[in-house]
């Protein structure tokens, strides 16, 4: 599509279909974000598809490939010189670890591809000293913006984030956390339709006894920590930014009342175990996104 159309369509996507990416699509995204265009001075300098101060290019690209046609699921590193993938390890026993380091965000964990970028600061610092850290911070934004635009151009979507458990993410990628460490990540997939509240909630229920809701009280942990409490005859969801009353839809599902401090949350539902105890809570935002929070004993 024309460049201005791609710019205008650029958006953050956090819902993806189960469709796989093709090798050609992955190859295109990798080339657009870290591809080598020219090497000169006997390999001392490299021009890539993204700018870098002094052509130092301090970033490395790691990939979790969940669903790419023709490539086994696993963790890989992109090798720009030669435009190749280096297999690092299988993910057969890593799913729970991924859930933990990515804070249970299903839209990231289950995406067909997850880009992880690490930085090797010394590549820039030896030449530019203190200003290097400003340069590095700006350059990762350029790389991720290229991923946004390249994704839009081929009918994919992405949403970058710097929220993850730092030391465990470094361990997962196999970097030392000092000379090389994770700075950003972004899931990529085919955008899915917005999740509507009618698809999120089940049938309503009248005259729910508030006492039956006491079992839902407690702490829930995910991207952030939430509290659920009963007070003044109502159930409340409590955040660091404020609290919001939950209107009963049925015994496990609730619609939020308007509160500008936490306006993004539209509805909440709880998942129970066989004994009726809450195991997790799912939150629907006004953007049609859902986030999971595990019950904390």
Regions found by a protein language model. Name each.
Residues 1-204:
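Acidic, surface-exposed loops and disordered segments
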Residues 199-297:
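Peripheral terminal and inter-domain segments
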